[in-house]
UniProtKB/Swiss-Prot annotation:
Mo-bis(molybdopterin guanine dinucleotide) binds at residues 258-263. SUPFAM superfamilies: Cytidine deaminase-like. This is Sulfur carrier protein FdhD. Its main location: cytoplasm. It comes from Yersinia pseudotuberculosis serotype O:3 (strain YPIII). Required for formate dehydrogenase (FDH) activity. Acts as a sulfur carrier protein that transfers sulfur from IscS to the molybdenum cofactor prior to its insertion into FDH. Disulfide bonds: none annotated. Belongs to the FdhD family. It is found in: Cytoplasm. Keywords: Cytoplasm, Molybdenum cofactor biosynthesis. The active site is at 121 (cysteine persulfide intermediate). GO terms for biological process: Mo-molybdopterin cofactor biosynthetic process. GO terms for molecular function: sulfur carrier activity; sulfurtransferase activity.
Length: 274
């Protein structure tokens, strides 16, 4: 399998996922100049030769994305269910070819659904409303987080957003330990993709104690993905939706929104928060 490493802050000359383009800057006078824009390309996830989904994503950390998506969608239960990941750039996008174990591929074929172009919609391609909610084993109560350490994590979040710092155009997802130290993270133009990338990286790291921190709002799908990968606490910089709160309550996940320096809103299972 492709090696997955935690993201690091890079110089602008090294940054993947951003390009400079000619623009016309308008203030009082029109002035031609160059500006950085985040890249957004179609990425097809292909399992054992069969295309499963095409999503718009920033073309970096794609092996982590493939692993995290496979885990958070319940296609696999552990990284060992994937034998290989191969990334193939093409003229119209990127193919990520994932070789599944025969048992997992058989399961995928049974539940396979047509899902195309899902950048922010978890309902696309689902035939029945009941299929929106995947069965999730209720999380145990083994984690705790002191909100005094949240400020430390928030101050470090931009470290995993080199493209975002250049363009102002990406979401971030990071894993923070109970002391608020940011252990690793990812960015993407899509908030769900950024989270999947993080979950893929976490699956290859010994990170158990801690929480997920995202720079976006918390939708039901963000909650579902987090819980599917066994994380017990999700901090969102913005708000949560009503459905996100319902799903978090049901699966025993502690959901925290409006995570800002010195304050936060705890929506569900506050016993994990000190």
């Amino acid at each position: 399998m492709s090696q997955i490493k935690p993201s690091r802050l890079s110089s602008s000359a090294e940054i993947r996922g951003a390009r400079q383009l000619d623009v016309l800057q308008r203030h009082k006078l029109a002035e031609p100049q160059q500006d950085w824009l985040a890249e957004e390309v179609p990425v097809a996830l292909v399992y054992n030769g069969i295309s499963h989904v095409v999503m718009m994503a920033t073309p970096k950390d794609l092996a982590a994305f493939a692993l995290g998506f496979s885990l958070s969608e319940g296609i696999i239960s552990s990284p060992q269910d994937i034998y290989a990941i191969e990334i193939t750039p093409g003229c119209n996008g990127i193919e990520v070819n994932i070789e599944l174990s025969s048992r997992r591929f058989a399961g995928l074929k049974e539940r396979r659904r047509a899902m195309a172009g899902r950048t922010g919609c978890g309902v696309c391609g689902i035939e029945q409303l009941d299929d929106i909610f995947r069965p999730i084993t209720p999380l145990p109560f083994t984690q705790a987080f002191n909100l005094e350490h949240l400020d430390t994590a928030l101050a470090q979040l931009k470290q995993v957003q080199p493209v975002g710092q250049l363009t102002g155009c990406t979401h971030a997802a990071a894993w923070i330990n109970p002391e608020g130290e940011l252990l690793g993270g990812c960015e993407d133009v899509g908030r769900h993709v950024a989270l999947d990338k993080l979950l893929g990286i976490r699956a290859k790291q010994p990170w158990q104690q801690g929480a997920v921190l995202v720079s976006s709002r918390a939708s039901y799908e963000m909650v579902q993905k987090t819980a599917m990968c066994g994380a017990e606490i999700l901090f969102a910089v913005s708000a949560a939706t009503t459905l996100a709160v319902e799903v978090a309550e049901r699966c025993n996940l502690t959901l925290v929104g409006f995570s800002k320096p010195g304050r936060a809103t705890v929506y569900t299972h506050p016993q994990r928060i000190k």
